[in-house]
Regions:
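Bacterial N-terminal signal peptides that target proteins for export
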Residues: 7-9, 27-42
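Intrinsic, low-complexity polybasic segments
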Residues: 10-20
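Vicinal oxygen chelate
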Residues: 21-22, 56-63, 67-75, 94-95, 121-137, 146-172, 194-199, ...
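Bacterial N-terminal signal peptides
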Residues: 41-52
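Core segments of cupin and vicinal oxygen chelate
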Residues: 62, 73-130, 167, 174, ...
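A short acidic/small-residue loop/turn micro-motif
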Residues: 100, 140, 212-214
Length: 233
C-alpha cells in the first residue's frame, strides 16, 4: 500500500515516483514512514516470488499466489489491537500513519474514499497460521458508523480455526465477549465442522470454527479448501 503522509502534498509526477519506488522525503520523520512502507512492499513481493505454493489458474489474475491480508476499519485502533492481541492471542507486527492529503484527490484516487479522509493509524496483526489482518482507523466527512450485519450487502466476518470449540467459547464467555449458538454441522458438504459466532467489542462479527476430522466435501472434491491445520496444502 502506498499512502502519502499527513500534510504531504504530491504533484502528479511525484505521486508516480512515490508509487514506483517509495521516494523518501528530506524530512526525517516522513522519510522513516516511507522507509517502512518501502520495506513492507519489498518484503511482500519477495515472499510472493519465493513462495512454493502453486500459481492460480492460467485464466485468472496473473501471478496470483494467495490471500495476503484482509483490511478492516475500526472505530478505535487501540481498542481493536488490544482485543486481537490480549483476548484473541494474535501478534501485533507493525503500525504506521497518519496519512492524508486535503489539497488534492490523492486519497480518493488511491483508496476510493473521500479526498479529505484521514487514516490515523494502520496496524497489522498476525493470528497463528493464515493471512494477516490489517486494522485501519479513519476519519472522513462522509464516514458511516453502522456496522453491517452478515445479511447486509458488504457484510463480512473473520473466522478463526480452533482445536476445541467448547473450550474456545468458554474462554470468550469468561472474557465477557458476546457469543452465539454453537452449531455442529452434520449434513451436506460442510458436515464435520462446528461453528460459533461472536462479536468484537465494537460489533465486528467473528467466528470460531473447528473440523478436526475434516469435512464431507473432501471425500469427493479434487480441490481442498486451505486450512490452518495443514497450511502447506
Amino acid at each position: 500500500m502506498m499512502i502519502k503522509p499527513k500534510q504531504r502534498i504530491l504533484s502528479a509526477a511525484e505521486t508516480g515516483a512515490a508509487a514506483a519506488c517509495c521516494r523518501t522525503s528530506p524530512d526525517q520523520e516522513e522519510s522513516h514512514v516511507f522507509e517502512q512502507i518501502r520495506n513492507f512492499a519489498i518484503g511482500a513481493l519477495g515472499a510472493a516470488m519465493l513462495a512454493g505454493a502453486p500459481q492460480a489458474h492460467a485464466d485468472g489474475l496473473p501471478g496470483l499466489r494467495g490471500h495476503d491480508h484482509t483490511g478492516i476499519t475500526v472505530p478505535d485502533i487501540k481498542q481493536a489491537t488490544d482485543f486481537f492481541v490480549n483476548v484473541l492471542g494474535c501478534k501485533s507486527v507493525m503500525s504506521f500513519g497518519p496519512f492524508s492529503d486535503d489539497k488534492t484527490t490523492f486519497m480518493h484516487d488511491l483508496l476510493n474514499v473521500d479526498p479529505k479522509s484521514v487514516i490515523h493509524q494502520i496496524t497489522l496483526v498476525r493470528c497463528g497460521y493464515g493471512s494477516s489482518i490489517e486494522l485501519f482507523q479513519y476519519s472522513a466527512p462522509d464516514q458511516k458508523n453502522m456496522t453491517p450485519k452478515n445479511s447486509d450487502i458488504g457484510g463480512h466476518h473473520i473466522a478463526f480455526y480452533v482445536d476445541d470449540i467448547k473450550a474456545a467459547k468458554d474462554y470468550l464467555d469468561s472474557k465477557g465477549v458476546k457469543t452465539f449458538f454453537t452449531l455442529p454441522v452434520k449434513e451436506g458438504p460442510a458436515a464435520g465442522q462446528t461453528i460459533t459466532y461472536f462479536l468484537a467489542p465494537w460489533g465486528l462479527q467473528m467466528e470460531i470454527i473447528s473440523y478436526p476430522q475434516g469435512m464431507a466435501y473432501e471425500k469427493t472434491s479434487p480441490i481442498k479448501l486451505w486450512s490452518p491445520t495443514d497450511p502447506g496444502k
